[in-house]
C-alpha cells in the first residue's frame, strides 16, 4: 500500500448518511436497454432511503425496471480540505400512495431543470459505502508545462 492509499478513509454507514444529507445533487446510474447511463438528480434523504422527483422519461423508465440502480454523491470540506464520495446501491419504487406521497411532497426537493417533475421515486438501499480523502496539493500533480498555452487544435 502506498502512502496515498493509506490516507483514504472508508466511511461507516452512519457517516455516509450524514454526508448524503449535506448534499442535494448526485448522479443516478441506471441500465438503459443494453448500456449503463448516468443522470444528475436532485435528491433528499428520507428515513434511510433516497428520494428524487422527475418527469416521465428514460431516467424514470430505467429506474423502475427490474435492474438495480446506484446513486453517487460527493462533496468537499473547505475546513479540512478533504473530499468525500458516497455510493448508495439498491432498488427503486415509485411513491404514489396517499399519505406516502403527501409526506414526500414536503421534502426539500428542488429540481434545477424546469418542467413537469410530478413523479417521486424512492431508492431503497441494499448497500451504502463511502470514502473520505485529502485533496492533493496541486504541486504534487502540476507539471512545469501545466500552464503553457496550447494550440487551438490540441
Please place each PLM-identified region on the residue numbering.
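Short, basic, glycine/proline-bearing loop/turn elements
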Residues: 1-3, 44-45
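C-terminal edge-of-domain segments
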Residues: 2-4, 81-83, 100-154
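Short, basic/aromatic recognition patches
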Residues: 3-27
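Short beta-strand segments
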Residues: 23-55
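Beta-strand residues in well-ordered beta-sheet regions across diverse protein folds
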Residues: 29-31, 53, 72, 124, ...
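Short, surface-exposed beta-strand-loop junctions and turns on beta-sheet-rich folds
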Residues: 34, 58-60, 137-138
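Conserved hydrophobic/aromatic beta-strand scaffold that supports enzyme active sites
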Residues: 38, 42, 51, 70, ...
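Short, structured beta-strand-loop surface elements
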Residues: 56-119, 127
Amino acid at each position: 500500500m502506498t502512502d496515498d492509499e493509506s490516507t483514504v478513509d472508508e466511511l461507516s454507514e452512519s457517516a455516509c448518511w450524514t454526508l448524503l444529507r449535506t448534499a442535494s445533487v448526485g448522479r443516478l446510474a441506471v441500465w438503459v436497454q443494453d448500456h449503463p447511463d448516468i443522470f444528475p438528480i436532485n435528491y433528499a434523504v428520507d428515513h434511510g432511503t433516497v428520494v428524487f422527483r422527475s418527469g416521465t422519461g428514460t431516467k424514470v423508465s430505467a429506474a423502475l425496471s427490474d435492474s438495480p440502480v446506484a446513486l453517487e454523491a460527493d462533496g468537499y470540506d473547505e475546513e479540512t480540505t478533504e473530499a468525500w464520495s458516497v455510493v448508495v446501491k439498491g432498488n427503486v419504487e415509485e411513491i404514489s400512495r396517499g399519505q406516502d406521497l403527501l409526506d414526500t411532497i414536503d421534502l426539500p426537493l428542488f429540481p434545477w431543470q424546469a418542467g413537469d417533475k410530478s413523479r417521486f421515486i424512492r431508492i431503497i438501499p441494499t448497500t451504502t459505502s463511502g470514502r473520505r480523502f485529502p485533496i492533493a496539493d496541486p504541486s504534487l500533480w502540476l507539471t512545469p508545462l501545466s500552464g503553457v498555452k496550447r494550440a487551438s487544435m490540441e
